[in-house]
Each structure stands twice: as structure tokens, then as C-alpha cells.
């Protein structure tokens, strides 16, 4: 049977749309805590066998990040041994188990509705399981899309994974808002009283005892859909060539690129995958340092302190309905992510990172100056928006693009795993430290610190990060060899 000479764009798009569901789940899982954390706090404050301190609250709000570190660290080994597709199926299963377990941490064993230390530990274990799914998806989804997509549109398609992450965060902001509904105000007012408010019944009781369960449980829908649909997409041609399944790899390439082009691409892939593996420091320490520090700065600028605690921050500013502002912030984030998608190949990576760093510094310092002043409430909100929007067109998407591009071919798999693991480690550090630092040192100090780090990030990019716009991956190998 004669193969088509032109590829099927519809087939490619359908594959990518399934793959970016992993990105959507990445965003959904990491942002669901923003609406649930105050309910969780009030619920566990009623425990009699331990005291739910700021430390416990910070740990519970960020426990999924422990799993993210584990999942990202294992991503290279799993993707190489299991394949990209099976790794993503596993991630989908982890998402589903975590959503169900976080909704019902009692799991028919512990008494429902009775807060205690054992229940808190079980809840956090389920969040760690979800984090493993996030860590895997954060590394393998861009890898899968990059290996399945034609080279002329690869950058654009990989960027849509970041769009899906932000879209997932926006979706869960809406979900959280509609789950709470009229229960929002009573729930916020009751946090200081913990379970005392629950004992009186009413709207606060539902929000604190049940609302957060629905938020986590809602993730079962996209998680189940992703785990099911990913079963029907092909493995990547690059992985198939690595394990000697050339015929199958060529058939997939032909469906995407056409038969004639498929033969050329397969030859290039085979030349790449048969190259001798090199040691991590073959290209020097600077190469690894740049990749790792890109990940560190992406988190150290403090963006997840906004994403995870947005309702709490807006409430502390004095706004009556913080969930509405959180949803609006999500819409702004989505729009500015599109700015990056449409400008990264025109302006380059470094200019966007430097401009974004300075914009974040301006926004963070603005928050530090205006926070707590009722006369500057609107200016404080605008500063938060500037801070968040600046991240979304710079460090949010561009960091992932650079991490995928900056490492030489022969060390990319291991180097990306290390860089992404550092990203999740610092994500955990920032999100765990935010509440204790803000409560003890003040929001002004916390955001002032983030502003200083943003300025340091701009200097780092200016001095050390190479521009990868218009360069092939082989050019990066030559660059690091030269240096």
C-alpha cells in the first residue's frame, strides 16, 4: 500500500492536544491548593491530638512538591526505560489516585470528619502521589511533544504546553470559585475560629468540612480523561528508534510528515540516538550551572507564593471577595502567556527574560511598599498583577524553552532531569517558607526580598545565559565545546 507523501496535520494536532492535557493537569494540581488551603487550615485547627501551626500549614500546602521533586528526578530514567507514552500513562494514574485520596483521605479506615494528625499525614501522602504525577508530566510532556512534532513548528507546539499549564490553573480557579459559591465569606471569617465555627453548623461548616474535598476530587475528571486518551496516542519515533523499532517509528513519522520526509527524519534520528553517551561534565561546569540556575531563579523569584496563596493575599490586602480577584488574575496570566508564544521567536529568549525580571521586580517592590495601606489598596492589587503578568511572558514559558535547548544532545536527558528537580526543590522552599516568613517578618519584607531576587535574575541572564534564538541544538554543542 502506497504511503501518503504529505503528513496529516489533524493527526498531529490530535496527538499534541492529548499530550498537553498533562500540562493542564500540572497546572490544575499545583493551583487547586489556592482555594482549598484556608478550608484545610480551619478543618485541621480543630484537631485535639496536635496543634496545626504555620509550619504544618506551609507543609500541607506544599507537600505535593515533595512528589514533584521525586517525579522529576525519576523522569529521565522512566522515560528511557518505560518510554514516553507509558511514563505519561503512569503520571495520569498518579493524578487520579491523588485526587480521590485527597478528597477522601479517610479511605474507609479513619473516621470521616474527625481531624487528627494521622489524617493529616495520610492527606499529605496522597498529595505527594499527585506531585509525582506533576513531576513526571513537567518533564515528559514537553519531551513527548518535542519528539513527535516537525522541527519547523516544534517550538510553538512545545510552548502550548505552558499555555495548558496556565489554562489548568485558570480552570481550577473557576472550579474552586463555583464550588464555594455563597460559602466563600463565611469560610474566610471562620478560619480564626477553626472547628468552633463548624460546631455551629451553617455555610462555614460546609465550606470547611466539605468544600476542600470537592476541590481536590474535581481533578479526577481531567485525570481520568488524560490517563484514558494517552493510551491511544503513539510512542514517539525517537524512543522507538532507540529501542530498535524502526519500522514503527517510520510509520508514525510518515503519518505526520509524509513518507518521503519520514525516511530523512528517521535517518537523522538514528544518527542521533546511536551517538556515544558522554559524561555530565564533558562540556564543563558552566553548562550545567546555567541550566540549573535558570530553574532556581524561575522559582526563587517567588511566583508560586502568589499562585498557591492568591486568595489569602487578596484577603490580607482588604478585598471582600478574594476568589473573584484570583480568577481575574488567572485570566491575566493566560493572556500574557500568549504574549510569550507569539514573541519568543521574534524577540529572542534573553530579552523576554530580562524584561520580565525587571517587570517582576517593579511589581514585587510595589507590593512591598503598598501592602497593608488601605489608601493604596488598588495600587497594591495592580502591583500583584504586574508581578504575575511579567512572569507569565518571561520566566514561566521561556525557562522551559531554554532548558530544552541549552544542553548538548548527548547529556540532555540527564541534565534536564537535574535542572527540573532543582526547579521543584526551590518551588517547595518558596511555597513552604512564604506563610511563616510573611507572618513573622511581614509581607513588605517578603515581597521586597522577591524583588531583589528578580533583579539578580536579570543580571544572571544578561551575563551568563546564551541566546538560543535561531540556533540548532547542534550549535549549542559547539558553543559549550568552545567555552
Regions inferred by a protein language model and the residue ranges of each:
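Short, well-structured alpha-helical segments
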Residues: 262-271
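Alpha-helical transmembrane bundle of multi-pass membrane proteins
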Residues: 1-248, 252-254, 271-483
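Short helix/loop segments within enzyme catalytic domains
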Residues: 256-258
Amino acid at each position: 500500500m502506497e504511503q501518503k507523501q504529505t503528513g496529516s496535520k489533524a493527526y498531529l494536532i490530535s496527538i499534541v492536544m492529548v499530550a498537553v492535557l498533562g500540562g493542564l493537569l500540572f497546572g490544575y494540581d499545583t493551583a487547586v491548593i489556592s482555594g482549598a488551603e484556608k478550608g484545610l487550615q480551619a478543618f485541621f485547627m480543630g484537631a485535639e491530638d496536635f496543634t496545626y501551626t504555620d509550619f504544618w500549614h506551609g507543609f500541607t500546602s506544599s507537600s505535593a512538591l515533595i512528589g514533584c521533586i521525586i517525579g522529576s528526578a525519576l523522569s529521565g530514567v522512566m522515560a528511557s526505560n518505560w518510554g514516553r507514552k507509558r511514563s505519561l500513562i503512569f503520571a495520569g494514574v498518579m493524578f487520579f489516585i491523588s485526587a480521590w485520596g485527597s478528597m477522601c483521605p479517610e479511605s474507609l479506615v479513619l473516621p470521616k470528619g474527625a481531624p487528627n494528625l494521622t489524617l493529616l499525614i495520610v492527606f499529605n501522602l496522597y498529595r505527594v502521589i499527585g506531585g509525582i504525577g506533576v513531576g513526571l508530566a513537567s518533564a515528559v510532556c514537553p519531551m513527548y511533544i518535542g519528539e513527535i512534532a516537525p522541527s519547523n513548528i516544534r517550538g510553538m507546539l512545545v510552548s502550548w504546553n505552558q499555555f495548558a499549564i496556565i489554562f489548568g490553573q485558570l480552570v481550577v480557579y473557576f472550579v474552586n470559585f463555583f464550588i464555594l459559591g455563597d460559602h466563600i465569606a463565611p469560610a474566610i471569617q471562620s478560619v480564626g475560629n477553626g472547628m468552633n465555627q463548624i460546631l455551629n453548623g451553617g455555610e462555614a461548616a460546609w465550606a470547611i468540612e466539605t468544600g476542600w474535598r470537592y476541590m481536590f476530587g474535581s481533578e479526577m475528571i481531567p485525570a481520568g480523561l488524560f490517563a484514558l486518551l494517552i493510551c491511544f496516542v503513539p510512542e514517539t519515533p525517537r524512543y522507538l528508534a532507540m529501542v530498535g523499532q524502526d519500522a514503527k517509528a517510520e510509520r508514525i513519522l510518515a503519518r505526520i510528515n509524509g513518507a518521503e520526509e519520514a525516511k530523512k527524519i528517521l535517518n537523522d534520528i538514528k544518527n542521533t540516538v546511536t551517538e556515544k553517551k558522554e559524561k555530565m561534565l564533558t562540556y564543563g561546569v558552566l553548562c550545567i550551572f546555567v541550566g540549573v540556575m535558570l530553574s532556581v531563579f524561575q522559582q526563587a523569584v517567588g511566583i508560586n507564593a502568589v499562585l498557591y496563596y492568591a486568595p489569602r493575599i487578596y484577603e490580607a490586602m482588604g478585598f471582600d471577595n478574594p476568589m473573584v480577584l484570583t480568577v481575574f488574575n488567572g485570566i491575566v496570566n493566560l493572556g500574557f502567556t500568549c504574549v510569550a508564544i507569539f514573541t519568543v521567536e521574534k524577540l529572542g529568549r534573553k530579552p523576554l527574560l530580562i524584561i520580565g525580571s525587571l517587570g517582576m521586580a517593579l511589581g514585587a517592590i510595589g507590593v512591598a511598599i503598598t501592602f497593608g495601606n488601605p489608601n493604596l489598596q488598588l495600587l497594591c492589587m495592580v502591583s500583584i498583577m504586574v508581578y504575575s503578568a511579567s512572569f507569565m511572558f518571561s520566566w514561566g514559558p521561556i525557562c522551559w524553552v531554554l532548558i530544552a535547548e541549552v544542553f548538548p544532545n548527548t547529556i540532555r536527558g540527564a541534565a534536564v532531569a537535574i535542572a527540573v528537580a532543582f526547579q521543584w526543590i526551590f518551588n517547595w522552599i518558596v511555597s513552604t517558607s512564604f506563610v511563616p516568613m510573611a507572618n513573622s517578618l511581614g509581607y513588605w519584607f517578603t515581597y521586597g526580598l522577591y524583588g531583589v531576587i528578580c533583579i539578580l535574575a536579570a543580571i544572571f541572564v544578561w551575563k551568563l545565559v546564551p541566546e538560543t534564538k535561531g540556533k540548532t541544538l547542534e550549535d549549542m554543542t559547539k558553543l559549550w565545546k568552545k567555552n
